[in-house]
């Protein structure tokens, strides 16, 4: 059964007699989550899970069951469920969801596990992960947002889904309004040259953004 007690079909077990190594046919649980081996000889048997369903975690434990003449034996085993990880992306100022953001999910050994893109609700889900520590980082953000969100580490546990939240600010805009100093009427076709300067580098990096002209009134 699953960790929440619901029957779990589709799980395959291997039964072997320990005394002489006799192996019986592998059998798979049905819709009610059960398997029955009949007509067995008394003795001690090894029971081991061979495979499980995709959204659960394989149990590698080898269980021993002793059978006695005239007595049936029952063993109840559980599989933990794989956790899901949902990533949420929102506007840092308005809280509105931000679709179209690409996130990279990496495992503990830094190998890439998944690459997902947020949908219209600003979220993306990576399903059926193994328990462990994962790094979630932004790979790209849609315009007009800045890629300023730091990577986050998240620990996943069996039977527990997790959510992780990211926020981004929009790129700032500059509006220049040119007007007559006396009448305050707007002045058309005035040209301005704009340069961007960084305050995050020792050299004060500068970038020429170009020349812009005021629109018609």
Role assignments for model-derived ranges:
Residues 1-217:
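Solvent-exposed loop/turn and edge beta-strand elements of beta-rich ligand-binding domains
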